[in-house]
Amino acid sequence: CIVENDFIGSDEPYVLVAAINLTTFPRSLEVTLYGPWSDVDAGEVHSTFKIPPNLPQPIVDVLKLVLVVRTPFWGLDNKTAAAIAKPEDVVFLAAVLERDDGKPEAARALVKGSLTATLASGLNLKRDVLVPKLIHDMDSALAIPAEAPDLGFWSPDDRIGGTLELKLRARDLSQAEAGTAQKQLLFRGDSGEYRVNFILAPQV
């Protein structure tokens, strides 16, 4: 967190990542929710928690209730790592919001529904045409809850900037295959500023 949003109290940011596989027909999609994190203030660094292997499932279930668990947004089952042959084969879009009284899971569902419709109506669109449309439609979907009226006793979640594409290069894939690569996106808006780090690895 670089600049927090709330004038009183701490932020509760969350991240939505949309992952699209352009090699399948029809193109496949998943939207993954990370967070919200609690009690976030300017200057603090918060991360996802990597669950150790072979933990009993009851313990895993408890950890998921109290921590933001590290979940892979690729492959699209949120469980199994998947190889990326070329950067052009995938599209990764990310957005950051700060929770007030909204429901992050509802925002995730809105984004997934909107992007599913975009992919269905643009089956033959080339990547350079499709990506701007996906970004526009993801922003439009998130505007629905974020621009709801503030009723005093209920406040909508705040968007931190707009949707950004996590662009991969061939070098990123080579580094990830050899070990780990990291990418960053900076989200800046009237309601705060956040830097989000992404880990690329054979298995997160």
What feature does the model see in each segment?
Residues C1-V204:
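N-terminal amphipathic/basic membrane-interacting segments and domains
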